[in-house]
Regions:
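Glycine-enriched alpha-helix->loop->beta-strand junction motifs that scaffold or abut catalytic
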Residues: 68-73, 151
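Carbohydrate-binding surfaces of carbohydrate-active enzymes
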Residues: 3-4, 31, 35, 43, ...
Length: 215
């Protein structure tokens, strides 16, 4: 079947049915690729190993992908993108980092058991621009607990150490370029200590009192 990329018409709009067809085509192609990789991994992994990937993306049916190929899905949580250095950050009605609660609830709707593949631990940016400021003292703890409170059963931080080369040289991690002790690694240790006292919540299923429908 031939699927055409949607193009704007004379009225500067697209055909909504063509857009839907194209989006479904992109989603199906991506899901098929994930399924191919998942099947290979499943043949060789240990029984206790899990298969996951991180998302979520608007042009991908993550619900189907999770059912077809994954044990659970994971999410990349970067709340300080809400304060990025562009026009979007100050757009009217922008809920800033408060919308991350909605994002986490959306992930939970895809996979009741889910994890955080990348929890923000430093300032974020590429070699072309800086997008998000450094977390303030205590913010890593706040975001980690927010993820867990929304049902995350797994949290990992991106990245361990800020890389010294490549496109993401300004994407800071727990450690700075020097790899030396800093306040962020001390905060991670404190987070670990707090989570040791909360380990009984691991594996629990989040009980939501409110349901959201997004059309």
């Amino acid at each position: 079947q031939e699927v055409h990329a949607p193009r704007k018409t004379y009225s500067d709009s697209t055909n909504p049915h063509e857009v839907l067809d194209y989006t479904r085509f992109i989603s199906q192609g991506a899901r098929s690729f994930v399924k191919m990789q998942s099947d290979i991994i499943a043949r060789y992994k240990k029984p206790e190993d899990f298969i996951t990937t991180n998302g979520i993306f608007g042009n991908l049916d993550s619900h189907k992908m999770t059912r077809e190929s994954l044990d659970f899905i994971t999410y990349d949580s970067y709340p300080n993108f809400a304060y990025c250095l562009d026009a979007y950050s100050d757009a009217p009605g922008n809920m800033k980092d408060r919308k991350w609660s909605r994002n986490l609830s959306t992930v939970r709707s895809i996979s009741p058991v889910f994890g955080i593949m990348e929890q923000q631990s430093g300032a974020n940016g590429w070699n072309t621009r800086m997008e998000a400021p450094t977390p303030r003292p205590g913010q890593m703890t706040l975001w980690t607990m927010q993820s867990i409170a929304h049902g995350a059963d797994y949290v990992s931080y991106f990245r361990w150490r800020t890389c010294t080369m490549g496109t993401e040289i300004y994407w800071h991690g727990i450690l700075d370029y020097s790899g030396r002790e800093n306040r962020r690694i001390r905060e991670v240790r404190e987070i670990h200590r707090k989570l040791q006292a909360m380990k009984d919540v691991a594996g629990g299923i989040y009980q939501a009192r409110v349901g959201m429908i997004r059309d």
